[in-house]
Amino acid sequence: EPIDLLGKVFVFSKESNVDDVKLLTPQTE
């Protein structure tokens, strides 16, 4: 269920820093 995780991280990125998402999901970029 990688999509679920990505979606959750993406939403979190909006509330948190985008840098966190880049570190958590470097594949997205």
From Swiss-Prot:
Listed under subunit, the entry gives: Homopentamer. Pentraxin (or pentaxin) have a discoid arrangement of 5 non-covalently bound subunits.
Q: Name one GO cellular component term.
A: extracellular region
Q: Which organism is it from?
A: Hippoglossus hippoglossus (Atlantic halibut)
Q: Which UniProt keywords apply?
A: Amyloid, Calcium, Lectin, Metal-binding, Secreted
A Gene Ontology MF term for this entry?
A: carbohydrate binding
Which residue intervals define the domain Pentraxin (PTX) in the entry? 6-29
Explain how, and how many, cofactor molecules are bound: Binds 2 calcium ions per subunit.
Primary location group: secreted
Cofactors needed by this protein, per the record, are: Ca(2+)
| Superkingdom to which the source organism belongs | Eukaryota
Transmembrane segments annotated in the record for this chain: none
> Hey, which family's this protein in?
Belongs to the pentraxin family.
Under which name does UniProt file this protein? Serum amyloid P-component
Record's subcellular location: Secreted
Q: What is the lineage of its organism?
A: Eukaryota, Metazoa, Chordata, Craniata, Vertebrata
